[in-house]
Amino acid sequence: MQSKRYLVLEDGSFYEGYRLGSDNLTVGEIVFNTAMTGYQETISDPSYTGQIITFTYPLIGNYGINRDDFESLVPTLNGIVVKEASAHPSNFRQQKTLHDVLELHQIPGIAGVDTRSITRKIRQHGVLKAGFTDRKEDIDQLVKHLQQVELPKNEVEIVSTKTPYVSTGKDLSVVLVDFGKKQNIVRELNVRGCNVTVVPYTTTAEEILAMAPDGVMLSNGPGNPEVVECAILMIQGILGKIPFFGICLGHQLFALSQGASSFKMKFGHRGANHPVKNLETGKVDITSQNHGYAIDIDSLKSTDLEVTHLALNDGTVEGLKHKTLPAFSVQYHPEANPGPSDSNYLFDDFVAMMTNFKEKERHINA
């Protein structure tokens, strides 16, 4: 017999289901993800640190978990919510079940609940604090706790590397500032011949310049960009001296460093099917996204930044470039994993930008 578990929201509503994963019951911000596949990459994405993910696709876990598709060494989300979790996955690469991996990493979950109802609630009311309990009589107490608890402010500190390390390439040298990077960013750079040095988010502009890289990549990561003040100062210190490319949180920090402002979205963009229009080419890419904050488009008017991409669903800013300096960013995930690879040409654009900048510097110094 399956053990009962309850998902409780801060507004007092609750959902009865059955136990999935760990008994280490947690609280966090509940969000929803609309991707149909890629649950392993999703639960291991550091951008979900501290959050509870509701999967809108009704069956999760049907192809198991393998060791190669993790986007981080240790998942740092606070829970998952699914309609049905497969207990008997079938795939030639499968090594563990979803339940096994959640239990291993002390992540609780719940299955057998109406995920459509939960998703509608989040869409209507915005993201909420939520938690799990295995005892119905504890629900009222948990609601009070959720209404009072303060969630962590700086999740980047939890997931950023503590010491620099290198992923070897043969050509251009890139410093990747780790705000909670997905591993596929490193892979996309490596496959283009880049030697990647991953550094902590607290690394200063002076320390980066001393490494003399050909370019700087600002990674994705969790939480509110305004909290990561040290990175804003770092970006201001390297802008114009080295080409750089920002993704997701890196995109937001780039905008803030130039005087723009951000805002918390009602329920964010999380999924692998978000259409984005490239304003320079007129083309539309289907993109992978995972963010709960966005850049205020009106705040860009007094900056030297130009909007290059817009979300077709709600018109929010999805891409920026500096008007005169070699720097650009996107809000979505061109490295995918999960999701479509429509936009991985942006890594080629970054390599071309670094090569051109390096050649220009060579002529100036000749």
Curated annotation (Swiss-Prot):
Top-level taxon in the UniProt lineage: Bacteria
Gene Ontology biological process terms in this record: 'de novo' pyrimidine nucleobase biosynthetic process; 'de novo' UMP biosynthetic process; glutamine metabolic process; L-arginine biosynthetic process
Active site: C248 (nucleophile), H333, E335
Known pathway: Amino-acid biosynthesis; L-arginine biosynthesis; carbamoyl phosphate from bicarbonate: step 1/1; Pyrimidine metabolism; UMP biosynthesis via de novo pathway; (S)-dihydroorotate from bicarbonate: step 1/3
Gene Ontology terms for molecular function: ATP binding; carbamoyl-phosphate synthase (glutamine-hydrolyzing) activity; glutaminase activity
Domain Glutamine amidotransferase type-1: 173-360
Disulfide bond positions: none
Signal peptide (from-to): none
Catalytic activity annotation: hydrogencarbonate + L-glutamine + 2 ATP + H2O = carbamoyl phosphate + L-glutamate + 2 ADP + phosphate + 2 H(+)
Regions that span the bilayer: none
Annotated positions binding L-glutamine: S47, G221, G223, L249, Q252, N290, G292, Y293
Keywords from the named record: Amino-acid biosynthesis, Arginine biosynthesis, ATP-binding, Glutamine amidotransferase, Ligase, Nucleotide-binding, Pyrimidine biosynthesis
Residues covered by region (CPSase): 1-171
Subunit structure: Composed of two chains; the small (or glutamine) chain promotes the hydrolysis of glutamine to ammonia, which is used by the large (or ammonia) chain to synthesize carbamoyl phosphate. Tetramer of heterodimers (alpha,beta)4.
HAMAP family listed in its UniProt record: CPSase_S_chain (MF_01209)
Similarity section: Belongs to the CarA family.
Name of the protein: Carbamoyl phosphate synthase small chain
Organism whose genome encodes this protein: Staphylococcus aureus (strain MRSA252)
Gene expressing this chain: carA
